[in-house]
Amino acid sequence: MKILIINSGSSSIKFQLIDMSDESVLASGLVERIGETDTTEKNINCTFHPGTDKKHKIEICQTVADHRQGMLAAIELLGDKEQAVMSDLSEIDAVGHRIVHGGETMYQPVVVDEKVIAEITAAIPLAPLHNPGHLDGIKVAQELFTEVPHVTVFDTAFFQTIPPHAHIYALPYELYTKHRIRRYGAHGTSHKFVTNECAKLLEKPVEECNLITVHLGNGSSMSAVEGGKAIDTSMGVTPLEGLVMGTRSGDIDPAIMAFLNRNLGMSIEEIDHMLNKESGLKGICGMNDMRDIHAAADAGNELAELAVGIQTYRIRKYIGSYMAALGQVDAIVFTAGIGENDDIVRAKSLEKLENLGVILDKKLNAQRSKEPFCISTPESKIQVWVIPTNEELAIARETKAVVNA
């Protein structure tokens, strides 16, 4: 079975073709700058994995007016006869779609139908930057692949098991009943994937695993997992809540927004832009790439050093709070770009946790690997793992399960 994975955003389409017989990636690519009329840089690429160590990448510059043109460009690359990843597009057996927000009703992967489209549409106010692009991608993909099932996999689904005392805000209750304002979370596909992978490494049924999963990238989130199911997560109604991120503030005093409006004359739109695009690490030190921040800190930039301190202190606070929520923890899992590759952030995030059962092995923590590896000592009561996430494979597995059900 070959499955095409599509992550359709507002101005881009990420795609990956996976052969589920051995879960190998046949091709992966990106179409970006959709809707721009003055494209001068290469905005379409596809990397082919022909079953050997050699990869071949094609990059082109092409104006892409809309998602239909973008999808056609991706399909044209995938069907390139010279690359030999498949003989014909009819070899694609199913299409899996990543959906950021499914609201309260979409709690598991489902085959796309009118009801699913309606629910994704209804969740647009909760994910205005993402869900419209997802809908465009689904519509175009269904037109181009008419004979195969299309399956939606929701980032919010993993968090539907979070109990009311953890997902309801202390606001007038009618804001929840009438407007569905509650904690939804994000990165659920990633958190679920590393949860299942960690269970294998611990050699325990996932239903017996209590974990703290730490997804650190330009967007970052954490989850408390009890018996393989999420009982809390750091992101909220939107991906703005929680950890300090690349350009997002994470947790702040809500009254700051009223202060900015009343005293600085900032509009709601300006405040929203600032909190999402100009805050976080970038707001503190002017940079949001951890490599640049570490280099600046090493060169004596005090604000860069402060940014890392604020970031990792927030992570450590969440680890402590999730330990209290879970009672007993089997492992802490770091994943995503920063979580997998930044030993400094990992080490600082685990400082002062020895008395709580977390003992870091500095030598193990300093290594790099594309495979999962443990970074805690044998004496550590709580194991600490670095597990590379693979959201596309997770979506492919979910899609296969739905199609074969």
UniProtKB/Swiss-Prot annotation:
One annotated GO biological process: acetyl-CoA biosynthetic process
Residues at the site labelled Transition state stabilizer: 187, 248
GO molecular function, a single term: magnesium ion binding
Location of this chain's protein in the cell: Cytoplasm
Any single Gene Ontology cellular-component annotation: cytoplasm
Annotated positions binding substrate: 98
Name of the top EC class for this enzyme: transferase
Binding site for ATP: 14, 215-219, 289-291, 337-341
PANTHER family linked to this entry: ACETATE KINASE, ACETATE KINASE-RELATED
Subunit structure: Homodimer.
Function, as annotated: Catalyzes the formation of acetyl phosphate from acetate and ATP. Can also catalyze the reverse reaction.
Official protein name in the record: Acetate kinase
Species of provenance: Desulfotalea psychrophila (strain LSv54 / DSM 12343)
Source species taxonomy: Bacteria, Pseudomonadati, Thermodesulfobacteriota, Desulfobulbia, Desulfobulbales
